[in-house]
Design a protein with these regions (language model features):
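Signature of the first transmembrane helix
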Residues: 3, 12-72, 105, 109, ...
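Hydrophobic transmembrane helix module of multi-pass membrane transport proteins
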Residues: 2-5, 60, 96-238
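Specific pore-lining/lateral-gate transmembrane helices of multi-pass inner-membrane transport
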Residues: 78-96, 255-372
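Transmembrane helical elements of multi-pass membrane transporters/channels
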Residues: 18-35, 161, 182-197, 201, ...
């Protein structure tokens, strides 16, 4: 029996590692495709056009955040613990989201008209609202696949969507398409991704039945704590473009959006790892607390080891990044935003990992309070940051992202306090110290070379320097290397 248990544990470790690699590979390809759009879109639409796109997207997100009612995490966690419930939970989630999505989308369109936004912005809101309904349904399918740990199919849908999105967007840019056509690409590619994910559930269809109102109510109640956390978290993170437009101008929103896109592309790593490990963490929390703590530590260590050099690049050579992308001169205003964004990257990375660990350990009720405080503080802080940034620096976007970084630091501190006792230990601080020490030679080289007229090619020797220092200081575990080799050998 003990041998069977040991084999089962080894199988789970291999599955977890495989899921991490599959998701990470998917996110790497997605990053490259997203970067291609980031390369061309600001050049074509300019700061004002990019600001209008970002504003419409954030405006609709404020309404769309209420559609899932916090059920996405419920689907992942409950299905990971009992996969026989997948069909019933998925049907209930879809029945809940479709009417809510239509209602909230209609409210977003109506609100844009009542607020007398320009005809262009109203059209962009209509397109974004339609895409929001599709995305909400697709999210239910993706969450179910994540709970089943079927990340291969979920990754296939993501890749199809990203390939289509990047290809169509770039084609429309070179075709000189209007702004609303560019916004419509998200709706089209989201529909294709929905179809790909839905094809994974063909065998479940014969057994599906219409959920009862009691089942819908049970799912809503289970999602309520997550809904509070997600709603407050979204309001905190997505209101900046709206506030900036109120305080400054569409061009300033564009500077902020350009920097946010570059910072956002760096978040593929924690997104990949937390997506892959949430089901395993949810399962381990109820069955093996020691393994749960160990997995959280390794997850945080890997993410922060990769986040430190990315943060340094954004802080030290943002001008070279803007020059590489050949953005119009007006986007020079994004450089100070990127410098602050580099510091914020470390906080974003830590918050994503710690938040995932708290959710897996059933601590979502505690997260609601922290997210509520963050929202109540962040909105006036963003107003103040945007206003004073505009007055003193002629750049409200810098003040806005400074307020974001401050609130993110509060969330990281809050999540640390919510973790089960003994999850993180002094060894984690020592590891972060080693990673920081490994990054110092890279930072010195980067700072030295950035003073001369060098291109972004300097990132290649920087990566080599950091990698060598990580090996010397033992930031990379031999256990991790062995696991990767084992997974790759089995796949071969």
């Amino acid at each position: 029996m003990s041998e069977e248990l040991q084999r089962e544990k080894e199988s789970q470790k291999t599955r977890v590692g495989r899921n991490v690699l599959v998701t990470l590979a998917t996110q790497l390809v997605s990053w490259a495709l997203t970067f291609a759009v980031t390369l061309f879109l600001p050049r074509y639409v300019g700061d004002t056009g990019l600001g209008n796109l970002a504003f419409a997207d954030s405006f609709v997100v404020i309404f769309g955040v209420f559609v899932p009612l916090g059920t996405s995490t419920v689907l992942v966690r409950e299905i990971a613990r009992d996969q026989s419930r997948a069909g019933n939970l998925l049907a209930t989630a879809l029945l809940l989201r479709l009417p809510l999505g239509l209602v909230m989308g209609g409210l977003a369109v109506g609100a844009a008209a009542l607020l007398h936004y320009s005809a262009l912005v109203q059209l962009l809101v209509l397109v974004a609202a339609s895409g929001m309904v599709v995305a909400s349904l697709n999210d239910a399918l993706a969450s179910t696949l994540q709970g089943q740990e079927n990340l291969t199919r979920q990754s296939a849908a993501v890749l199809v969507e990203k390939f289509l999105f990047s290809g169509l967007t770039i084609f429309l840019i070179f075709s000189r398409a209007p702004l609303w056509a560019l916004a419509s690409v998200t709706l089209l590619t989201g529909t294709v991704s929905l179809a790909v994910n839905a094809s994974a559930f063909r065998r479940l269809l014969p057994g599906l039945r219409l959920p009862s109102l009691a089942e819908v109510r049970t799912l809503v109640i289970a999602g309520t704590p997550f809904m509070g956390w997600i709603v407050f978290r979204t309001l905190y993170s997505r209101t900046d473009p709206i506030i900036l437009r109120l305080v400054t101008s569409a061009a300033t929103v564009g500077w902020y959006a350009a920097a946010s896109r570059l910072v956002g592309t760096s978040l593929f790593l924690p997104a990949a790892i937390t997506t892959a490990l949430l089901p395993a963490l949810s399962r381990l929390h109820g069955t093996d607390s020691a393994a749960f703590r160990q997995l959280v530590r390794r997850m945080l260590g890997i993410v922060m080891m990769c986040g430190i050099p990315i943060a340094l690049v954004l802080m030290l050579v943002p001008g070279q990044l803007i020059a590489l992308l050949h953005y119009p001169p007006s986007f020079q205003h994004s450089i100070p935003v990127l410098r602050v964004g580099g510091l914020a990257v470390l906080l974003y990375y830590a918050a994503m990992v710690l938040g995932t660990a708290v959710v897996a350990s059933d601590g979502q009720n505690k997260m609601v309070r922290a997210s509520m405080i963050a929202t109540l503080v962040s909105i006036p802080a963003c107003f103040a940051g945007a206003y004073f940034g505009e007055v003193y620096w002629k750049n409200g976007a810098t003040g806005a992202i400074l307020s974001d970084a401050a609130v993110e630091a509060y969330l990281v501190f809050s999540y640390l306090r919510m973790l089960p006792a003994g999850t993180l230990i002094g060894e984690n601080l020592v590891f972060l110290g080693r990673c920081t020490a490994a990054a110092l030679p890279m930072a010195a080289f980067l700072e030295l070379m950035s003073r001369s007229r060098t291109g972004v090619w300097i990132l290649l020797p920087c990566a080599a320097i950091y990698g060598i220092m990580c090996l010397i200081l033992r930031c990379i575990s031999t256990q991790d290397i062995a696991m990767v080799r084992q997974i790759l050998a089995k796949r071969a």
